[in-house]
């Protein structure tokens, strides 16, 4: 669940480190022929985060999670779609490493080689999070690591290479991805549409996926 925001301390603002400025137009417009798969990517990220938390808990590196959960919430008034998980979360340093540093030594060559087959890019580089920008004009990520003494942080980006990273508030470990939808992508604040996508892409994922508190997927 997303907690109410208060005044936050700015930790950093800067530019996402990318090898080519072509990557954002590709992600925003042509990563997939069908924009709807952003939901699959974000839910899959949440499932991965839950698995990582379970593995880390075995070694005592972080707190345990009793049952993994992906929650999806719609705010029609704010035109937002939020995907939340109770996975391992991230520290500010991990956000900088995994979210800001979209940089790979072979990125430019790969983009050039596969620019007409852009579906491949997400899977090859693990850029599933950035599929958010196919439907959102602004993306906020609120995350808190399951490691002891961790401070929650809020990362925000408007689809350009610029970002802000602030101290945030989140009661429990996990991550919220808040999509501020573009005006021509408002189909994704329709409950029926989201329910259909959960059934299509997430039915047999190994954790519960709920919409407004109602479990939707069948699970394994």
Where are these regions (language model features)?
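GHKL/Histidine-kinase-like ATPase module
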Residues: 12, 192, 206-208, 212-220
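Membrane-protein biogenesis/insertion across secretory and organellar systems
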Residues: 20, 197, 210-214
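Juxtamembrane extramembrane loops of integral membrane proteins
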Residues: 185, 191-204, 209
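GHKL (Bergerat-fold) ATPase N-terminal catalytic module, capturing the glycine-rich phosphate-binding loop
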Residues: 1-188, 196
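Intrinsically disordered or highly flexible coil/loop and linker segments, enriched in small
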Residues: 36-37, 108, 204-207, 211
